[in-house]
């Protein structure tokens, strides 16, 4: 475990989600990390610890049916459902000024939350995610969105196949421990949640224009970090984040793929802490 990171459980929306936290626990201002798929609060452990070490409160939650957190009965595995869960989590933590850090599907989840409480958004860090004008689903997402085929694919995802698939297109390769951590959490409930979430999201680029219209006039401080070789969300979308965040600081990392916080952790930590330190 990273130094200074506390692991606990937090009662939210009828379940007890896993919480990673560092820094002053009573601060109402916090850096809030939202993971993507496949992922969990564990994705952010090192960055939670690093940010907490600067005196900023930092938190990361498991989303329902990811990591070690079981969704409550009736939970909707949709962007709106997860955004509502995030809102309730922030309320339970007493956080009302948010520096949002998001990755992958944590992007639409976090940005939809932000659209409902834009006054609470102090800054945003987008890591291979954000508004995606004109984006069409990648091949793996199309498999997940297809009935029967998606279920068969999920049922046959062995550890070895998972490692190969996730590492595909990653120039540096991802750390073995990171891959195994993701697979260990990729159980039946998470695999079902992934199918539901992707099947509910017909057009991942559709909300971008409305979000940009809402966010752009506010010129919220933003940091964009994108792996140059992301095979799921192409790096051309990095600069397009300025449609929503006109003054965004954009960094496209050579040699990185979809998980730059895993394949270039020192660079991501430096960029994030430098950005937050200037706010």
Question: Predicted regions: what is each one?
Answer:
Residues 20, 60-102, 270:
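Active-site loop/oxyanion-hole signature of alpha/beta-hydrolase fold enzymes
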Residues 229-233:
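Acidic catalytic loop of the alpha/beta-hydrolase fold
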Residues 218, 224-226:
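Short beta-strand/loop motif that positions the catalytic acidic residue
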Residues 115, 122-152:
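Flexible "cap/lid" loop of the alpha/beta hydrolase fold
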Residues 21-68:
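Conserved HGGG/HGGXW glycine-rich cap/lid loop of the alpha/beta-hydrolase fold
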Residues 248-279:
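Catalytic active-site module of serine/aspartate enzymes centered on a nucleophile-bearing elbow/loop
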Residues 1-31, 53-56, 95-97, 270-279:
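Alpha/beta-hydrolase fold catalytic core
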């Amino acid at each position: 475990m990273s130094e200074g990171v506390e692991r606990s459980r937090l009662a939210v929306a009828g379940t007890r989600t896993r919480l990673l936290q560092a820094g002053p626990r009573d601060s109402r201002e916090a850096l809030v990390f939202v993971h993507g798929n496949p992922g969990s609060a564990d994705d952010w452990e090192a960055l939670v610890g690093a940010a907490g070490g600067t005196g900023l409160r930092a938190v990361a939650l498991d989303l329902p049916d990811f990591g070690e957190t079981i969704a409550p009965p009736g939970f909707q595995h949709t962007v709106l459902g997860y955004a509502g869960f995030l809102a309730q989590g922030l309320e339970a933590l007493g956080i009302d000024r948010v520096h949002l850090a998001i990755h992958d599907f944590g992007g639409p989840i976090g940005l939809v939350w932000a659209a409902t409480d834009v006054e609470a958004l102090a800054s945003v860090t987008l890591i291979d995610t954000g508004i995606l004008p004109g984006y069409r689903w990648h091949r793996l997402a199309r498999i997940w969105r297809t009935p029967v085929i998606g279920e068969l694919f999920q049922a046959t995802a062995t550890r070895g196949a998972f490692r190969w698939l996730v590492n595909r297109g990653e120039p540096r390769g991802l750390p073995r421990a990171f891959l195994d951590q993701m697979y260990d959490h990729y159980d039946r409930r998470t695999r079902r949640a992934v199918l539901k979430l992707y099947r509910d999201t017909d057009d991942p680029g559709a909300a971008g224009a409305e979000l940009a219209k809402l966010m752009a006039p506010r010129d919220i401080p933003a940091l964009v970090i994108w792996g140059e070789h992301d095979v799921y969300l192409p790096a051309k979308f990095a600069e397009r984040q300025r449609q929503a965040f006109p003054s965004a600081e954009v960094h496209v990392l050579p040699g990185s793929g979809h998980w730059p916080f895993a394949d270039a952790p020192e660079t991501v930590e430096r960029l994030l802490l430098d950005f937050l330190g200037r706010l």
